[in-house]
Amino acid sequence: MSAPKNEMYYSLLEWFKTLNLNAPHADAESLADGVALAQALNQFAPESFTDAWLSKIKASAVGSNWRLRMSNLKKVTQSVYDYYSDVLNYSLSDFSKPDLQRIAEKCDLGELERLLQLVLGCAVNCAEKQSYITEIMCLEEELQANIMRALQELEATRQASTPEGGVASSLSRGSRTGLLDSKAVQEDRDALAQKCFETEKKMLLLIDEKTNLQQELHKLQQEFARLEQHSTVIGDDGVSLGPVQTGSVRYNELRRQLDLLKEELLQSEGAREDLKIKAQQQDTDLLHMQMRIEELMKSSAEVTTLKDEVDVLRESNDKLKICEAQLDTYKKKLEDYNDLKKQVKILEERSADYVQQNAQFEEDAKRYANTKGQVELFKKEIQDLHAKLDAESSKNVKLEFDNKNLEGKNLALQRAKDSLLKERDNLREAVDELKCGQLSSNTALTGTTVSRELQPSATVEKLQRLEAENKALREGQGGQTALAQLLDDANKRCENLREQLKTANERILSLSHASQSDDPILKESEFGKQIKQLMELNEQKTLQLEEAVTQSTSLQCKVTQLETNLSAREQEILVYDAKYRKCVEKAKEVIKSIDPRIASALDASVLEKSADLVEAEPKPKMSVMEEQLMTSAFYRLGVNAQRDAIDSKLAILMGSGQTFLARQRQSAPRKSLSAMKSK
């Protein structure tokens, strides 16, 4: 199974926390600046990761500056790679280099895992590796497993895993030691080849330097000869240096240069001699290594023979496993055969139970057939209720006609009331004219005659008295204050008279209305009582009809439930019958393989049982289903008709107290009574 995501990183972090460091190293952000990693490397190998190198790592003022983090991490990784190549002679070409930019910017856990993996390799391969290994062994088992897996991955990148690695567990001790020797020789050979390659590089460089020096010496000799031929030489500043003679300045300079070149030539020749000696030593080493390689080839041939033997043993082991698996399958088949026997017995018992249940269901169906009589009685009651509803609807039509007549009478009374109100308004206007006193005498006389005809005697006397007071006030020569007081008193009296006139008019109108409309009020009250009685009767009938409908629907629901139960039971019986037949067929096949005589006897018994089951199966009753569908359709039709009739009657009752135009504006009921009767 693959380890969870970043589990190895957290294990390496727990190991890194055990180190005694000055810099913080508890989480990914503290490790991203590279300071803690540099201190750990200095602690592991101070001879390689020196204090001078550690001082180059910027510990202060790093913060969130990813560029400084990047520079620190570059120094750390470069030093680690140099340590692996120079000190440990490990080649990390196959190991994926950690992405330092992602670590510096985002603190990526996967890249930090790779960097910590490299640091772990340095700790395990340093001089004090035993102490660090003991610290790792003190950790938890899960952490130890993850750390070992990290080391194995690092080792696998250093040297690719050989195909013999999977067989190493099944080899003998001799083969294991041979493999270890071959690995060690391979490592030595790689190291010597690397050293030979490096010495050859150095030798080529020295040869190039020697050729360059010889060329320069040849050039100098040519120039010296040329200068000796010329008598005068002009320097860089244009001054003649004179002939090259012993004791001159030019001669001394050239002599000094020649001595230097000779010394360099001697040094290069000494280096060449040293390289020759080293090359001879390496040739001898190569001869020894070739001898050892031949020995190892022989041991590898032995290892291949051992591998072949292991492959043969493995094939035999695989065959043994296949045989064991076949044996297990045969055992399971035998157990399945026993289980099938038990299931056949159980299915026989269940089939008997299902036959009994079918008989019970048939009896229940006969019982429910008796409920049909009750349903028919409910049908008759519903028809009677429909007839009563039709009679009540005809009565409601008659009452509506009477209501229209009463509305006509009410309109006539309303017109009379309007005429009386107009007369009252005329009287008010006459009173206002009297108050102002600005009309002519003729108009005053006509107004008084009209008021005398309409008003009672007490009001006439008051008006006469007020007119006399008015005349006296006009003829009098009192002050303005007295006139104002008299005018206020007159206004108050006029207002009192107005109120008295209002009360008198109201009494007159009420008396006239009572005298004219005694009989219509009684008729209206009687008509209202009749309407209320009819409404109560209608509500009672609707309640009775709803109760009957609910009873019929409940009975119908029970019938449908029983039908569904019957169909479900029949389906279950069919399913179990199919299973039973399959089990019987399997049992026959097994018994045929054991003894063919028993199989023929079983066929006969199974055929008899299947014939009995076919005879016991209930036959469908189409007539019962048709009757149930007819009754349900009739109930639905009756409910819809009843609802439409109630809606139409309610619409008629709602429109009885309104005018003809208001009734025409209202929405019609869903279906008329004629349509219901046609149904």
Swiss-Prot record:
GO cellular component term of the entry, any: microtubule
UniProt subcellular location = Cytoplasm, Cytoskeleton; Endosome; Synapse
InterPro entries according to UniProt: CH_dom (IPR001715), CH_dom_sf (IPR036872), Hook_C (IPR008636), HOOK_N (IPR043936)
Can the keyword Lipid biosynthesis be found in this entry's annotation? no
Q: Which SUPFAM superfamilies match?
A: Hook domain
Cite a single GO BP annotation: endocytosis
> Pfam families attached here?
HOOK, HOOK_N
Q: For this protein, what is any one GO molecular function term?
A: microtubule binding
State the coiled-coil residue ranges: 135-437, 480-574
Q: Domain named Calponin-homology (CH): which ranges? A: 6-123
- For this UniProt record, give its keywords in alphabetical order, as a comma-separated list: Coiled coil, Cytoplasm, Cytoskeleton, Developmental protein, Endocytosis, Endosome, Microtubule, Synapse
Q: Which PANTHER family match?
A: HOOK PROTEINS, PROTEIN HOOK
Q: What is known of its domains?
A: The coiled coil domain mediates homodimerization.
What family name appears in the similarity comment? Belongs to the hook family.
Q: What is this protein called?
A: Protein hook
